[in-house]
């Protein structure tokens, strides 16, 4: 079994993005701005994800802002950011608290500013695209291969399943509590993607 390392790809992408942002700043006088919106649910992992995004944005010279909202204010914040011509990208940090309708909230992001591609617009979400690029970089074609995806979350699993099934690939999905013993099932597959967090 070969484990693919995304670190080289991530480094390449980061260098490329830094060049693109420098070009925007120098030749077009555009300062890219990214806003992250979240609802505090007490989940400390959210803080970690936001801090990682902030560090990445700083590394590639993108201005970064964070908005802590609640159930009553998040939609208005998203509408405001979506209308603001000075904001170029918006991310809703997931997961949202269970009592909120995630799809309904995401639908308030202007699709042209939806960095994660989750608002129902025409963009393929970023992580599934990165997985495709990683496979391509290693020369792996999924045609005729048996593919397993473990997890069907909104950010990775579900959009990857949809993308690959639409491409005609043979994809089986495994999720916690579905009754399968992954130690028995997974070795049967040519390509395995874990999308479990």
Question: What residues fall within each predicted segment?
Answer:
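Glycine-rich phosphate/diphosphate-binding loops that line cofactor/substrate pockets in enzymes
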Residues: 21-32, 80-85, 139-142
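Short beta-strand segments
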Residues: 38, 91-95, 150
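Active-site cofactor/substrate anionic-group-binding motifs, chiefly glycine-
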Residues: 45-84
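Short beta-strand segments enriched in small/hydrophobic residues
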Residues: 31-41
């Amino acid at each position: 079994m070969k484990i693919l390392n995304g670190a080289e790809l991530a480094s390449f992408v980061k260098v490329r993005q830094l060049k693109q942002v420098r070009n925007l700043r120098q030749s077009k006088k555009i300062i890219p701005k990214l806003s992250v919106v979240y609802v505090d649910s007490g989940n400390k992992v959210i803080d970690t994800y936001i801090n990682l995004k902030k560090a990445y944005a700083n590394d590639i010279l993108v201005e970064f802002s964070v908005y802590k909202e609640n159930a009553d204010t998040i939609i208005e914040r998203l509408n405001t950011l979506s209308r603001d011509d000075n904001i170029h990208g918006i991310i809703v940090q997931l997961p949202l608290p269970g009592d909120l309708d995630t799809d309904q909230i995401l639908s308030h992001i202007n699709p042209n500013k939806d960095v994660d591609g989750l608002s129902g617009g025409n963009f393929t979400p970023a992580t599934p695209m990165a997985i495709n690029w990683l496979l391509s970089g290693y020369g792996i074609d999924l045609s005729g291969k048996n593919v397993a995806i473990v997890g069907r979350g909104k950010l990775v699993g579900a959009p990857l399943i949809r993308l690959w099934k639409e491409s005609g690939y043979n994809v089986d999905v495994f999720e916690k509590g579905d009754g399968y013993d992954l130690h028995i099932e997974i070795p049967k597959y040519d390509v395995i993607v874990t999308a479990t967090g």
